[in-house]
Amino acid sequence: MSLTADEYKQQGNAAFTAKDYDKAIELFTKAIEVSETPNHVLYSNRSACYTSLKKFSDALNDANECVKINPSWSKGYNRLGAAHLGLGDLDEAESNYKKALELDASNKAAKEGLDQVHRTQQARQAQPDLGLTQLFADPNLIENLKKNPKTSEMMKDPQLVAKLIGYKQNPQAIGQDLFTDPRLMTIMATLMGVDLNMDDINQSNSMPKEPETSKSTEQKKDAEPQSDSTTSKENSSKAPQKEESKESEPMEVDEDDSKIEADKEKAEGNKFYKARQFDEAIEHYNKAWELHKDITYLNNRAAAEYEKGEYETAISTLNDAVEQGREMRADYKVISKSFARIGNAYHKLGDLKKTIEYYQKSLTEHRTADILTKLRNAEKELKKAEAEAYVNPEKAEEARLEGKEYFTKSDWPNAVKAYTEMIKRAPEDARGYSNRAAALAKLMSFPEAIADCNKAIEKDPNFVRAYIRKATAQIAVKEYASALETLDAARTKDAEVNNGSSAREIDQLYYKASQQRFQPGTSNETPEETYQRAMKDPEVAAIMQDPVMQSILQQAQQNPAALQEHMKNPEVFKKIQTLIAAGIIRTGR
């Protein structure tokens, strides 16, 4: 079954990356043949392969075809510039690199290519005889050639030695002899430090460097200038051979090619993901990652693994995404998303500590409201889980008895600690809160005692002792009206649950609260002073401002017997009693 142009192109990209340029040319040729429409990128890629093989004429033909198909694509002119540079046509190379920069000022390869053209032009101007004068002016020339294993046998020919000595006077003469005596080519290469077995002689017209990610250690070594002990080589080191350190031409396998292809695979993966066909989605995300190293594809793959319930696999994928992202200096927002998804996976696994750890890492990279909310919820879950794991009724009873012992000894601080332990061990037992409230009250911590009583009442609304302790604390902080309300509730609950067994204690507290509520500041207080003091009480002020009560009080002034009739109403009775306690209504003495 024949492959598509895109499939051939992907295989060609892989072959190019592996430095198998002949194979890459074959695959790009097939891609060109099956492509429904002329594709400038395919010609550009094949041109890059030819350039890497130093087949500059073929590279030039493909580059011309590339710009013919798409004359507005700046990288096509990179290809033309590279081919012309390889052929030694510096003017055309310069012209095409400049054209590339006109179309795209950020074209890095064009800038590097143009710089190389300028360096080569300067070298030619500095040494119009290509450095031959310096090469043959070396007084140790013959001796060095005799010592070199590549040329030692040649130096046994006296006629050849005589020729070399003659070139000292006339170095241009070698141009005629090169075509008739191939030994001279070897000698020239040796003097210039060129290994004819390794590189084509045209390598001096080389291409811009390939991206670091596509270089191997061996290629870097091969690209370095060859070392030699001969003085003649040192003298010629300033010649254009310096440019031989350049490597093969980069191909368009990044944003304009591999990224586009990878995004297509990602889009296909997204379709399968939405259809909940996660295995197929993962397959496409893997292809996207193979085509272009963007950790977004790994994040997507992890999302599919997560939906499959393969949480540990997803965590492994996301850790790889973070590691790769660090190396590639990926956007911190993308890395933040990787950390967040690791947190999600750990949450599914029930590891709340790891969940919190990775949500925090995510927020360190990039703070978002969503992850912050998840972090807060996870922290609450962990706190709740730890509290639930701590529950132990037997330990709670031990703590209660310990607290009781401390309370009996008047060791209030340790009593509070013991009852706190009881609450942790049995958070639903109202007695722990009520007992701690009693100890806190002894320490004069009345607001905290009231809070504990409220918690005890919340846990057990029929716990009369909690109401009584709450009212006692409220009286201590002079919240008399609130204390009376609490005691009313206590009286009701006591009657319902305990048959009024605590009625006497409740009545005593009620009387105490009522008396202290409106207790005069001095024994010689005038009625006006009593009225002003009483009106500071919110309940008294509300009663006096009630239109119904105002009417009743006016009637009572004219007919005291009418007041007795109104007091048959429980609500009115309560309000009248409050006004009597406040000193607003004075009874006979």
Curated annotation (Swiss-Prot):
GO CC field: cytoplasm
UniProt keyword list: Cytoplasm, Glycoprotein, Isopeptide bond, Phosphoprotein, Repeat, Stress response, TPR repeat, Ubl conjugation
Modified positions (Phosphoserine) in chain numbering: S227
TPR repeats: 5-38, 40-73, 74-107, 262-295, 297-328, 336-369, 396-429, 430-463, 465-492
InterPro entries: STI1/HOP_DP, STI1_HS-bd, TPR-like_helical_dom_sf, TPR_rpt
Cross-link Glycyl lysine isopeptide (Lys-Gly) (interchain with G-Cter in ubiquitin): where in chain: K99, K168, K384
Coiled-coil blocks: none
Bias kind Polar residues: ranges: 226-239
Span list, region Disordered: 199-265
Pfam families named in the record: STI1-HOP_DP (PF17830), TPR_1 (PF00515), TPR_16 (PF13432), TPR_8 (PF13181)
Keyword Cytoplasm (UniProt): yes
GO process terms (BP): protein folding; protein localization; protein targeting to mitochondrion
Every STI1 domain range: 138-177, 537-576
Induction: By heat shock and canavanine.
Gene Ontology MF terms: ATPase inhibitor activity; Hsp70 protein binding; Hsp90 protein binding; mRNA binding
Basic and acidic residues composition bias: residue spans: 209-224, 240-249
Oligomeric and partner information: Part of a larger complex that includes HSP70, HSP90, and immunophilins.
PANTHER family membership: STRESS-INDUCED-PHOSPHOPROTEIN 1, TPR REPEAT CONTAINING PROTEIN
Protein task: May play a role in mediating the heat shock response of some HSP70 genes. It is required for optimal growth of yeast cells at both low and high temperature.
The protein's name: Heat shock protein STI1
